[in-house]
From Swiss-Prot:
It comes from Pyropia yezoensis. Binds 2 Mg(2+) ions per subunit. GO terms for cellular component: chloroplast. Its EC number is 2.5.1.-. This is Prenyl transferase. It holds the Pfam family polyprenyl_synt. Its cofactor is Mg(2+). InterPro entries: Isoprenoid_synthase_dom_sf, Polyprenyl_synt, Polyprenyl_synt_CS. Mg(2+) 2 binds at D88, D92. Signal peptide: none annotated. GO terms for molecular function: metal ion binding; prenyltransferase activity. Keywords: Chloroplast, Isoprene biosynthesis, Magnesium, Metal-binding, Photosynthesis, Plastid, Transferase.
Length: 323
């Protein structure tokens, strides 16, 4: 299901400007890095993260304005996210993302590593110029969290003993941390009080977890065409996600497939079938819905406004997409 344009209507103009600015970020004196970075941003994406920054910025402003610091924060958030995808694709040996070739597949691994590093460096430079130490600290911690999440994931490849709690914690580091910190950062740049800042951090955290669980479900249920990558790609790389973890108690034969690391040509298809048969997808959806409800509860103290309504609609969209 596509992201509805109406969800981001209150910040449509800001998102258009963001697209232009992201292309400018790729403007470097090194042609090959320029080509790699431009390829990434041209691939598009839902731009959920910067949209959330803009919506939170308007939701916490009496005049529903977005200041310069918040515009920079939205750009930084998307740059960091994009940089992390480049490195993730190298580690997971993905050949496509969003239906186009990954950077290391189009160029080579060396260029992809440098492109990811370049984007992280650019984000750090823009972040330093926001001139709000609390926001700088919060977003800087996210980059550390990315590394923490990747290490945790790497240590449990093809490990069926991983708990749901450990899965959630890893998902926080890899996905939710950035969304949580950027939502809080947008509110902080409006001078919001501690309670509002904390509520929006938790909103972003629960939204991020719901999105990650949703992506993990879609990795099982989606098609190569809709995903822009092969179904079961996470499993192929040894990343055992919630639908499979929930299925292990019902389908003992999954352990044999995991033990041989899905090496046979039919193993992934068999695994997807067993996950669907066992009810693992339903349980994963229920877990995502719990996160969605937790996110909604974090918005209850914000004054009603069009941006707040969009935040709620975006939250409900996750439930709709998982239905």
């Amino acid at each position: 299901m596509a992201m509805s344009p109406s969800l981001f209507y209150p910040v449509e103009q800001e998102l258009c400007s963001l697209e232009k600015n992201l292309k400018a970020v790729a403007g470097t004196r090194h042609p090959i890095l320029y080509a790699a970075a431009k390829h990434l941003f041209d691939a598009g994406g839902k731009r959920v993260r910067p949209a959330l920054v803009f919506l939170v910025a308007k939701a916490t402003s009496e005049k529903q304005d977005i200041n310069t610091g918040q515009k920079r924060l939205a750009e930084i958030t998307e740059i960091i996210h994009t940089a992390s995808l480049v490195h993730d694709d190298i580690i997971d040996e993905c050949t496509t993302r969003r239906g186009v070739k990954t950077v290391h597949n189009l160029f080579n691994t060396k260029i992809a590593v440098l492109a990811g590093d370049f984007l992280f460096a650019q984000s750090s430079w823009y972040l330093a110029n926001i001139e709000n130490l609390a926001v700088v600290k919060a977003i800087s911690k996210v980059i550390t969290d990315f590394a923490e999440g990747e290490i945790r994931q790497g240590l449990v490849h093809f490990d069926p003993s991983i708990s749901i709690d450990a899965y959630i914690e890893k998902s926080f580091y890899k996905t939710a941390s950035l969304i949580a910190a950027s939502c809080r950062g947008a509110a902080m740049l409006n001078g919001s009080n501690h309670q509002i800042n904390n509520d929006l951090y938790l909103y972003g955290k629960h939204m991020g977890l719901a999105f990650q669980i949703m992506d993990d479900v879609l990795d099982i249920t989606g098609s190569t065409k809709s995903l822009g990558k092969p179904a079961g790609a996470d499993l192929i790389n040894g990343n055992l996600t919630s639908p499979l973890l929930f299925s292990l108690t019902q389908e003992a034969s999954l352990n044999d497939l995991i033990d041989r690391e899905f090496c046979n040509s039919t193993d992934i298809a068999s695994t997807l079938f067993l996950i669907k048969r066992s009810g693992g997808i339903t349980k994963a959806k229920d877990l995502a819905k719990e996160q969605v409800q937790a996110a909604l509860s974090c918005l209850q103290f914000l004054p009603q406004s069009t941006p707040v309504s969009s935040l709620k609609e975006l939250t409900h969209f996750i439930i709709t997409r998982l239905s």
